[in-house]
């Protein structure tokens, strides 16, 4: 195993997930606000599941998205 390759890879993956998921959430909130589906002061439960089948890893992370 190449430690440098591994370390770079495990840093890149969460960064990509973070940036992409933030963009998706921002678009969903803007669409919901524009259509009047939400007021803009809500709190939404949110979860993300990390699956790495080759390592038999499945971890769920839970939190909330607060608009105000």
What do these predicted regions represent?
Residues 20-27:
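Compact soluble domain cores
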């Amino acid at each position: 195993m190449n430690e440098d390759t591994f370390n770079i890879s495990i840093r890149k993956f969460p960064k990509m997930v973070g940036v992409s998921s933030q963009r998706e959430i921002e678009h969903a909130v803007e669409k919901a606000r524009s259509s009047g589906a939400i007021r803009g002061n809500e709190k939404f439960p949110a979860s993300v599941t990390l699956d790495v089948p080759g390592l038999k890893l499945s971890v769920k992370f839970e939190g909330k998205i607060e608009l105000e």
